[in-house]
Regions:
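Conserved beta-strand signature within the Rossmann-like core of class I S-adenosyl-L-methionine
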Residues: 178-186
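Class I SAM-dependent methyltransferase Rossmann-like catalytic core
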Residues: 34-64, 70
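A short glycine-rich, Lys/Arg-flanked "PGG" loop and its adjoining helix->strand segment in the class I
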Residues: 90-94, 163-177
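A short acidic, Gly/Pro-enriched loop at the edge of an enzyme's catalytic core
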Residues: 133, 138-148
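Glycine-rich SAM-binding Motif I of class I
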Residues: 83-87
Length: 257
């Protein structure tokens, strides 16, 4: 069966309540910014200027609205990098919550500033922890996380020669029933071979949905953030495209039973 046909079959199994929407971006941003928890996280005085300068291009308030972190929840930010999203979620879950920052050994070797001991010099929040594993070796106690976040890194799993399916099985086991996985990434041409998509540092929202549904997750919402400046034939780092790509924010849930 062709990948597109398999994807169509998987999506047909998704609940009718699933919403796939082309976002009214200004309205969505305005609504998200009005959320007191999001506003407090964005205004946190411990945030660096570099992080604040990233907010507008990332439209991060839309991502935080999808994450919907609540006080006391436990989260993991996979492929966390510098901790941009993890630190925002840390503010939202508060002192009784917890956020783990995950990076791979390969990333740490390439970018030494991601090394946990170096990050601990800068990051002082007591509700932050660190996890270092490959994508497919990531593990946690069964049913231990309320939230799993992947910001612009889901495509990296395949790009780096690992299996998204193998990783997703582990994510499913780690997540509490009713918990959610929020994936934001650069959208791709769905008919393009997957290896070609990820070579452009992209992955189509349909491919992600198909893989996550296959792992047992339910697709709850798929918000499409389209840009007039993007051309999905090109690498996301191409001048004129970089920072202005078509993106999606997908929310998946682990069924209660």
């Amino acid at each position: 069966m062709m990948r597109a046909s398999l994807l169509a079959a998987l999506l047909a199994l998704a609940p009718a309540a699933t919403a796939q929407t082309q976002a009214d971006i200004p309205a969505l941003r305005k609504e998200a910014k009005a959320d007191p928890a999001i506003k407090a996280a964005l205004d946190d005085k411990t945030r660096t200027m570099d992080a604040r300068l990233e907010d507008d291009g990332r439209m991060v308030e839309i991502i935080l609205k999808a994450i919907d972190a609540k006080p006391g929840e436990r989260a993991i930010d996979i492929g966390s990098g510098s901790g941009y999203l993890a630190l925002l979620v840390s503010s939202m879950v508060g002192p009784k919550g917890h956020v783990d920052m995950h990076n791979t050994p390969g990333w740490i070797n390439q970018f030494p500033t991601m090394e946990p001991e170096r990050q601990k010099i800068r990051i002082k929040q007591p509700n932050i922890g660190w996890v270092t594993t490959t994508w497919t070796d990531i593990s946690g106690a069964p049913n231990s996380y309320d939230i799993i976040v992947m910001g612009q890194v889901y495509h990296d799993v395949f790009l780096e020669g690992e299996s998204n399916d193998a990783m997703n099985e582990r994510l499913f086991a780690m997540l509490k029933p009713g918990g959610r996985v929020v994936i934001e990434d650069h959208d791709a041409i769905e008919t393009m071979p997957l290896a070609q998509q990820v070579g452009l540092h992209r992955i189509s929202h349909g491919d992600v949905a198909g893989q996550m549904i296959r792992a047992g997750f339910t697709l709850k919402t798929m918000t499409l953030l389209e840009s007039t400046h993007d051309d999905r034939r090109f690498n996301v780092f191409r001048p004129g495209v970089r920072g202005r790509t078509d993106r999606f924010v997908a929310v998946f849930e682990k069924p209660l039973k």
